[in-house]
Structures are given as C-alpha cells and as structure tokens.
Amino acid sequence: MFDALANINWEVIFQLTSVALIIIAGPAVIFVLAFRNGNL
C-alpha cells in the first residue's frame, strides 16, 4: 500500500487539482456576482 502511494506523483495531482479549482471557481464567481446583481 505504501509503495502504491509512493508511486503517485503528488505534484502533478496538486497541479491538476489547482487548475480544476480555478476553472470551476472562475465561472462560479461570475455566476454568483451576476445572480446577486454585482452587490457584495
């Protein structure tokens, strides 16, 4: 089990996760601002 975890490239996973969050968060923030008429 530890060998399997060691073989995982955590840096790549972290980068992919970061990119995914940015891609999802971008439109989400725009949608929230539009939904609230730009009022924070």
Curated annotation (Swiss-Prot):
GO terms for cellular component: photosystem II; plasma membrane-derived thylakoid membrane. It is a single-pass membrane protein. The chain crosses the membrane at residues 12-32. Keywords: Membrane, Photosynthesis, Photosystem II, Thylakoid, Transmembrane, Transmembrane helix. It is found in: Cellular thylakoid membrane. It comes from the Bacteria. It holds the Pfam family PSII_Ycf12. Its main location: membrane. PSII is composed of 1 copy each of membrane proteins PsbA, PsbB, PsbC, PsbD, PsbE, PsbF, PsbH, PsbI, PsbJ, PsbK, PsbL, PsbM, PsbT, PsbX, PsbY, PsbZ, Psb30/Ycf12, peripheral proteins PsbO, CyanoQ (PsbQ), PsbU, PsbV and a large number of cofactors. It forms dimeric complexes. HAMAP family: PSII_Psb30_Ycf12. Belongs to the Psb30/Ycf12 family. A core subunit of photosystem II (PSII), probably helps stabilize the reaction center. This is Photosystem II reaction center protein Psb30. It comes from Nostoc sp. (strain PCC 7120 / SAG 25.82 / UTEX 2576).
